[in-house]
UniProtKB/Swiss-Prot annotation:
Tissue expression as described in the entry: Expressed in heart and kidney.
Pfam families: Hormone_recep, zf-C4
UniProt feature coiled coil, ranges: none
DNA-binding region: 603-666
Residue positions binding Zn(2+) 2: 637, 643, 653, 656
Keywords, alphabetical: Cytoplasm, DNA-binding, Endoplasmic reticulum, Lipid-binding, Membrane, Metal-binding, Nucleus, Phosphoprotein, Receptor, Steroid-binding, Transcription, Transcription regulation, Zinc, Zinc-finger
Protein name (record): Mineralocorticoid receptor
Region (Disordered) residue spans: 234-331, 353-372, 681-706
GO cellular component: endoplasmic reticulum membrane; GABA-ergic synapse; glutamatergic synapse; nucleus; presynapse; receptor complex
SUPFAM superfamilies cross-referenced by the UniProt entry: Glucocorticoid receptor-like (DNA-binding domain), Nuclear receptor ligand-binding domain
Residue stretches of biased makeup (Pro residues): 688-697
The record's account of how the chain is modified after translation: Phosphorylated.
Amino acid sequence: METKGYHSLPEGLDMERRWSQVSQTLERSSLGPAERTNENSYMEIVNVSCVSGATPNNSTQGSSKEKHELLPCLQQDNSRSGILPSDIKTELESKELSATVAESMGLYMDSVRDAEYTYDQQNQQGSLSPAKIYQNMEQLVKFYKENGHRSSTLSAISRPLRSFMPDSGTSMNGGALRAIVKSPIICHEKSPSVCSPLNMPSSVCSPAGINSMSSSTASFGSFPVHSPITQGTSLTCSPSVENRGSRSHSPVHASNVGSPLSSPLSSMKSPISSPPSHCSVKSPVSSPNNVPLRSSVSSPANLNNSRCSVSSPSNTNNRSTLSSPTASTVGSIGSPISNAFSYTTSGASAGAGAIQDMVPSPDTHEKGAHDVPFPKTEEVEKAISNGVTGQLNIVQYIKPEPDGAFSSSCLGGNNKINPSSPFSVPIKQESSKHSCSGASFKGNPTVNPFPFMDGSYFSFMDDKDYYSLSGILGPPVPGFDSSCEGSAFPGGIKQEPDDGSYFPETSIPSSAIIGVNSGGQSFHYRIGAQGTISLSRSPRDQSFQHLSSFPPVNALVESWKPHGDLSSRRSDGYPVLEYIPENVSSSTLRSVSTGSSRPSKICLVCGDEASGCHYGVVTCGSCKVFFKRAVEHNYLCAGRNDCIIDKIRRKNCPACRLQKCLQAGMNLGARKSKKLGKLKGLHEEQPQQPPPPPPQSPEEGTTYIAPTKEPSVNSALVPQLASITRALTPSPSMILENIEPEIVYAGYDNSKPDTAESLLSTLNRLAGKQMIQVVKWAKVLPGFKNLPLEDQITLIQYSWMCLSSFALSWRSYKHTNSQFLYFAPDLVFNEEKMHQSAMYELCQGMRQISLQFVRLQLTFEEYSIMKVLLLLSTVPKDGLKSQAAFEEMRTNYIKELRKMVTKCPNSSGQSWQRFYQLTKLLDSMHDLVNDLLEFCFYTFRESQALKVEFPAMLVEIISDQLPKVESGNAKPLYFHRK
């Protein structure tokens, strides 16, 4: 049974008796782990001292080659490298003093062991005050000063240093683990020396700065990590330096050293090192013949920690940790300057392993060396690994980040310690934030080499003659009443099956393949593009077929029927409802149709984010305010009226910005009509009052209650389908609104002075551009293509001036409220320009028509139908080839105008009166057109002399119309007799 003995022998006992007791004690302590119990480790105070010059195997290396670090309190002369016979008495007296110190330190250990330490305590005072701790040290120092102590030389170097290591399991129950460290059996020239207070190169041990090194896993700082055997290189810890792993013990700053992470049950209870040994190694005085070394290292509760440092004898030149004879050339553990942790290993010889609390480094790890781990204190993944003597793993810690949750961020998936790694826990490494898990992108994005085609109904990409009416009109297309059962995309929709079973009929190189989607946008596929591509027709061959965008009613009704494959179909961008649930209200359907998936609105003028619909166009607030103020000014462009207007450059040119606003369709009258629409909606939303109940007969005295029938699902769907059918059925007014020509720019050059010739030439060029738009508009007019081509050309030739002047009056009414003549966004006539154009009276006549629009508050639906009637208002006297078709078409549009007038909330009398005023306005256009044609014919004849230019389109029309009008072959159609 292992016991704990404290030797306090009287001072006058014989020295030989003490040496024999020491030998017996050490022999009794050398029992194996099987002969020990779970009691605390046997404690003996071992004081090992040596002369720095004692190097048995290399005596030529004297003290002159060494730098000795002297204790500040012991300024002794260390020049002597040998031991005199007269020093034996001094050695015996020092042994007696060591026994006294051992007794006092044993009492100190009992007090410290019973003390309770908190977990986070760093500088807590133990049961023994610092004064008492220092008192023993002071007595020892005094004794050395009085007696002129000299350390003895270890004469028997070949004798093994017997040390003892208790079973590490003895500290499992919370007791303080005192690891008895074994030193190498044979110490030769490369082994670190066991130094006396005079020659201790690896520690500074004055009472003012005693370094009781305690490595802690919580802080590495700038202090080295110490093994349980040696303290490493010299390190002076001043009182001002605070380190969780190293404390300064002086009379002022003396404290019981405890690990900052130690638990209350397993506190670090290491004795304070005495000045001669400066370690927690408690040993009797070393014998020249037999130096049994026994270091007591305290490790609290699996704390991988070292408290003391003991240098083995010989070779004081080598500042290294305790090493095996084969690995003694390793440098120090750490330096406060470099902060580099270099670990050494100790080899095992003759069955006595040298135990070090160090991680083997790849440079010093040798074959045959095995390491015994000390228990660790940190919990990794809530698993405590208790070191056992048989295990070969070294438990060293690198303090992780405060979060502690580094299991998922470490490279390893487990906590297995790699023997070849200097760290037991894998070092945390941040994952790359730029790593990509997907496959790399293959191929370059296709670039569209073709500009986005205009989405309007009119395109200038026809292969026909631009300056020929017959060329523009071309072959007839299906009329308004034609069937729309066919596909809405004559060129076919691009299909790309995955199996590659479809191939185009013609063999075309992949680099020349062009696809056109339903919106008219072209796509150019690069060479080597995978997948099959169906060829669409060329944009030049596309003929305008607006009617294909309006589905027939029967097709719409059929789409409501449930189909098995309806969910897998695509509806060309329009959602197709499979069924209508019973409990779905109109507000729910409205919220679904106007969901968050709709793209954000963009200003049609500058491209900025739109704030709403202003003056009839979706624009931003900036363009709204600009248009409101700009219509009152006459801006001039410093360039060629083609400035870029976008979000950044919209303020550069107000003329081009106003021109773009007008081109987008902004007008001041839209605000008034919007207010009228709101008032109209309020009248319509007023609930109708239920009819009063029938008067009750007093004779009968009975009350009749009308039978109420709850609507079923079918009866509720029928009116909904009927209303949807009526709403989606394209009316002529809806079609006319969709095919309305866009505003054309005149290309007016304001840098030149305004003259009659330049203004008239500009008006003629503008009229030529507008005529192209008029011909294209008439080509898609419902019912107009049913007429023979010759009749179509004749009607356009007779009515072109009437259509141009009527459209001018509408633009002036919408954009300037009939204050100016709005020929184009870049050409607006005020009074001055009217005089300069040499046609002031004609301009005033056209302005009067525009003022009539203001008086009647003409709507766009009325205007569009009236314009069609003006196209059909002049015919040859001999009549047309298909007069019947012409009469039918004209009658249909007159009826449509009548319906449009009756839609107003006015009474029937007021609607007829409005119809009369509108038709009267149409009749007044003939008188104005006659005057305009007369002036036009005159300038056409005298164009050479007047230097007035006429475009090719007008030359063709006027050349055919002039002889017919002058011969009286033109017959205007009036609604009212003069």
